[in-house]
């Protein structure tokens, strides 16, 4: 990935030619600076990506705006990945005397390219104008031959953006050509291939047809051609003297020619669909899909936003034919009944952002995508790591499938009928070595990892496992990835009530095995993550800028990877020496002084671009392991700093060919941009924790479903700015003031509101208290709770407030800066058939609970104080402590001293519902009525135990120390500052 560069805005189709949101999309964004985007036409998640080809390097995988020529227009492309792939069935137009029979450069007319969502056009040499659009499974072309009497259309199946294998073309008649090409390979990860079948139909009969073979020799009237590899193709020639336009519809399939033909005829109404109709339908489809998000912003901001949203909705791509058949990961043909199979999963990238965005704005596709992943596990024998069509490439490292699946469980996009087996597959995937007979490598080191809590690191340039397996030569980064995937599983398990929660939340802390406290770093810091050798020793042969061959960290330095523990903020702060040291190191990493001096600009200290992996120890804004780094500040009480970083980062997405920060990686960075622009980001997969930041739009609404009546998330951001930092003064979630720096995604999945008030004041106190910090998913506060009964006394007929008991926390957990905090708490007190909500007041080591109550009759009662963790405990965490309760003796005094149930000689028949009393205690009453009003003295001390209804059998009074009930610890997360008081309210028990 390379840096964004200043350039003129990329061309787009004139507004008069297209209306709606599709017209705002600029597909040329990301086509330079190693962005590797394709500018052609496609439908949302479309099987066909019909686009010009003029490059196939790692810097420009299919298209470069600097090359003012094309080879032609092929039907399948990968959205902004790091390596060339696909490029099958290349259509090459020509107005020359002879047709093109190999991949040749066809000159473009400068300034003639234009595109928007669903449409692309360019003028070529010889007076040829090419126009492209698509349905989901069909590429639709229109070629105008304005300056010639003859037009040739060559379909080249022997050359692709990779090394094509066998291929075949056959003329069915003078309007229809069918065949296939075998293609494959991606980033050096695999040599496996797959077949792409096609069925092409011209809008009129060709005047002549023919084929060419491996020699490149064209043979007119040849009905077919077969190749074992190399050149191969067919030509259709038309008389364009009077009718200058030729249209062609090309259906593709991964199953067979019959599937390609059925896709074509079904989606073109039996070949009657015109290019104009297809284009209008494509634009309407994009208008609807993009319409899931509406924003109030400037036109420039809307162009950038909808361009990025468009990129987020390109993949995974549809893989099943109109009849539901698809090619599975086992290479066999299967059928999706009642749903649509999707394929090509760039999981190492997309688990971080795209799965979440799809669940919000493309939920119907999201559930089908999840079901597709399930089928890939069933048919392929294991979850994929990085699948391209039906090919497992096994590129990248870690265990991204686990995090991706966990996030979908949390987002509610796992269909109920597959939820249980999919969960079982998920746990197996994370704990078991991959079987030897499956293509996916999974967690090869699972046994070692389960025992030692890290992946053994082997140098890739030395004998050993590192030369053979990516997981081992990337032992450092893969260990970090495993930990966050395990935390994601644990969080999703907790949310869904599954028993694996505690185990996997604890495994989320295993990244700490990599922390070497003795390494001295730039900036006078000490301690960093190191890859760990099989014997448990650190890889100290690596310095902080070494590349992966020396460090074991893939696509990033150890400085950058140290922050990839967002599931364990507390642990990260602890190993760095406390919150202050953590913040100081963050400031150095982001170069905060430069950000403050030049707001909205990227400091020179940052990595120069996404693929500038190893030359900088500073922030890399364009590569996946670091994209959640800005929100680290919210875990340490400084949420304003998040917006300083984001203002600079989001400005790296201009409306230019270099817009973005390198590879979008199949929608990952685009999804990140969309959500950050709206004011939130899913910083820990599986948790449902959406970290907040200042939106860059004035208002937005998200349609959380496919229909017009679907629930809506409304976002309002008073005081927003589109390029400069703004800070959160206040937030309301669903109408309730919200001081925490995050919200739970479940709060908005059924619709809701996020109301921001923004300010230019960087010193706004919002989100700075300890209770408001981003919580650690994998490092919960652990406390033991014990409840002690009080000695409350009430006067009959008078509303009185008394202390009914207290809860003390033993072994209080201290955060890195040694400030002691308490869990949130919920408490009820039940007596005489009525339940009261007890009001907590913080003490030195817990809470004291008071109840305001009124009892009608004097007597001794037995009450129960029940205390549990507060309702605002995060859904991804167990309760802070197990619920505790204690029986509380309650004395209700009468208006007359003779009504005092504790006085000797009191007639129990005066209060037949209460038993006799025990001996009174001596502790003072917390609150007592004025004796002058009651006509008697106030009793004191602990009340005795209640007797039976007949007046006999009263318990002896409890000792002054009170009764205690111990609670055993459960993992928890959310902390709150001492002194919080809950409002008491009274409710009748049913």
Where do the PLM segments sit?
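Residue-level recognition of secondary-structure-to-loop junctions
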Residues: 853-857
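Short, solvent-exposed loop/linker segments at the N-terminal edge
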Residues: 791-802
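Beta-sandwich strand segments
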Residues: 816-819, 872-883
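Aromatic sugar-binding surface patches on proteins
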Residues: 228-232, 843-850
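A cross-kingdom C-terminal cell-surface attachment/processing module
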Residues: 960-986
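Accessory carbohydrate-recognition regions in carbohydrate-active enzymes
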Residues: 13-355, 359-403, 409-468, 472-480, ...
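Sec-dependent signal peptide cleavage junction
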Residues: 2-15
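C-terminal low-complexity, Ser/Thr- and acidic/Pro-rich disordered "stalk" regions positioned immediately N-terminal
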Residues: 891-959
């Amino acid at each position: 990935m390379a840096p964004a560069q200043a350039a003129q805005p990329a061309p787009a189709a004139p507004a008069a030619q297209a209306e709606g949101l599709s017209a705002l999309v600029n597909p040329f964004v990301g086509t330079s600076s190693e962005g590797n985007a394709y500018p052609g036409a496609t439908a949302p998640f479309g099987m066909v990506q019909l686009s010009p080809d003029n490059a196939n390097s790692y810097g420009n995988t299919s298209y470069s705006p600097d090359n003012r020529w094309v080879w032609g227009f092929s039907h399948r492309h990968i959205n902004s990945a790091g390596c060339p792939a696909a490029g099958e069935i290349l259509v090459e137009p020509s107005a020359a005397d002879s047709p093109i029979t190999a991949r040749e450069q066809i000159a473009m007319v400068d300034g003639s390219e234009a595109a928007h969502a669903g449409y692309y056009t360019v003028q070529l040499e010889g007076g040829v104008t090419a126009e492209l659009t698509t349905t989901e499974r069909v590429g639709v072309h229109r070629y105008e031959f304005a300056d010639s009497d003859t037009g040739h259309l060559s379909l080249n199946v022997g050359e692709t953006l990779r090394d094509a294998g066998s291929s075949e073309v056959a003329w069915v008649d003078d309007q229809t050509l069918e065949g296939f090409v075998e293609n494959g390979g991606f980033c050096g990860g695999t040599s496996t291939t797959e077949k792409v079948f096609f069925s092409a139909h011209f809008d009129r009969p060709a005047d002549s047809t023919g084929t060419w073979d491996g020699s490149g020799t064209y043979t007119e009237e040849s009905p077919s051609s077969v190749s074992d590899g190399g050149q191969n193709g067919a030509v259709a020639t038309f008389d364009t003297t009077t009718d200058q336009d030729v249209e062609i519809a090309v259906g593709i399939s991964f199953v067979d020619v019959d599937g390609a033909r059925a896709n074509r005829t079904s989606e073109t109404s039996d070949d009657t669909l015109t290019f104009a109709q297809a284009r209008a339908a494509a634009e309407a489809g994009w208008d609807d899909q993009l319409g899931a998000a509406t924003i109030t912003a400037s036109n420039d901001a809307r162009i950038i936003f909808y361009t990025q949203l468009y990129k987020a909705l390109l993949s995974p791509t549809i893989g099943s034919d109109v009849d539901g058949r698809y090619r599975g990961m086992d290479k066999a043909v299967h059928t999706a009944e009642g749903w649509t199979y999707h394929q090509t999963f760039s999981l190492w990238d997309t688990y971080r952002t795209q799965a979440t965005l799809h669940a919000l704005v493309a939920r119907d596709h999201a559930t089908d995508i999840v079901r597709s992943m399930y089928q890939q596990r069933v048919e392929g024998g294991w979850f994929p790591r990085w699948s391209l069509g039906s090919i497992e490439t096994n590129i990248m490292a870690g265990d991204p499938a686990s995090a991706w699946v966990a996030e979908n469980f949390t987002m509610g996009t796992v269909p109920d009928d597959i939820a249980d087996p999919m969960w079982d597959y998920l746990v197996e995937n994370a704990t078991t070595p991959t079987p030897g007979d499956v293509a996916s490598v999974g967690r090869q080191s699972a046994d070692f990892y389960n025992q030692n809590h890290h992946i053994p690191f082997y140098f890739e340039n030395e004998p050993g496992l590192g030369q053979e397996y990516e997981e081992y030569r990337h032992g450092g980064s893969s260990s970090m990835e495993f930990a966050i995937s395990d935390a994601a599983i644990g969080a999703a398990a907790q949310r869904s009530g599954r028993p694996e929660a505690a185990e996997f939340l604890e495994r989320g802390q295993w990244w700490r095995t990599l922390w070497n406290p003795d390494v001295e770093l730039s900036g006078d810091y000490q301690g960093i993550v190191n890859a760990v050798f099989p014997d448990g020793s650190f890889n100290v042969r690596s310095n902080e800028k070494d590349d992966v061959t020396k460090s074991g960290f893939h696509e990033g330095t150890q400085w950058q990877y140290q922050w990839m523990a967002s599931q364990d903020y507390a642990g990260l702060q602890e190993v760095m020496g406390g919150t202050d040291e953590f913040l100081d190191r963050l400031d150095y990493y982001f170069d905060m002084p430069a950000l403050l001096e030049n707001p909205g600009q990227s400091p020179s200290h940052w990595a120069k671009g996404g693929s500038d992996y190893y030359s900088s120890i500073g922030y890399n804004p364009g590569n996946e392991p670091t994209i959640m780094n800005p929100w680290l500040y919210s875990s340490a009480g400084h949420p304003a700093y998040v917006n300083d970083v984001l203002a600079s980062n989001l400005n790296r997405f201009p409306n230019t060919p270099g817009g973005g920060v390198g590879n979008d990686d199949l929608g990952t960075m685009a999804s990140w941009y969309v959500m950050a622009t709206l004011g939130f980001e899913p910083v820990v997969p599986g948790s449902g924790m959406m970290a907040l930041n200042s939106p860059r739009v004035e208002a937005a609404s998200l349609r959380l479903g496919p229909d017009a009546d679907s629930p809506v998330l409304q976002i309002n951001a008073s005081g927003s700015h589109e390029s400069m930092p703004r800070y959160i003064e206040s937030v309301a979630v669903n109408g309730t003031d919200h001081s925490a720096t995050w919200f739970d995604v479940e709060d908005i999945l059924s619709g809701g509101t996020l109301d921001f008030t923004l300010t230019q004041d960087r010193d706004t106190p919002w989100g700075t208290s300890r209770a408001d910090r981003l919580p650690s998913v994998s490092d919960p506060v652990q406390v033991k709770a014990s409840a002690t009964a009080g000695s409350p006394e009430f006067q009959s007929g008078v509303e009185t407030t008394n202390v009914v008991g207290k809860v003390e926390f033993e072994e209080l957990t201290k955060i890195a800066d040694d400030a002691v905090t308490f869990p949130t708490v919920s408490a009820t007190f039940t007596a005489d058939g009525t339940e009261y909500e007890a009001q907590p007041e913080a003490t030195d080591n817990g809470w004291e609970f008071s109840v305001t109550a009124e009892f009608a009759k004097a007597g001794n009662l037995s009450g129960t104080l029940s205390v549990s963790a507060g309702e605002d405990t995060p859904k991804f965490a167990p309760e802070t402590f197990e619920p505790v309760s204690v029986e509380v003796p309650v004395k209700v005094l009468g208006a007359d001293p003779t009504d005092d149930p504790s006085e000797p000689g009191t007639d129990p028949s005066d209060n037949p519902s209460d038993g006799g009393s025990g001996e009174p205690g001596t502790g003072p009453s917390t609150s007592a009525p004025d004796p002058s009003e009651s006509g008697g003295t106030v009793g004191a001390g602990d009340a005795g135990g209640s007797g039976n209804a007949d007046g006999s059998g009263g318990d002896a009074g409890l000792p002054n120390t009170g009764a205690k009930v111990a609670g055993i610890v459960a993992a928890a997360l959310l902390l709150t500052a001492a002194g919080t008081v809950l409002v008491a309210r009274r409710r009748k028990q049913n």
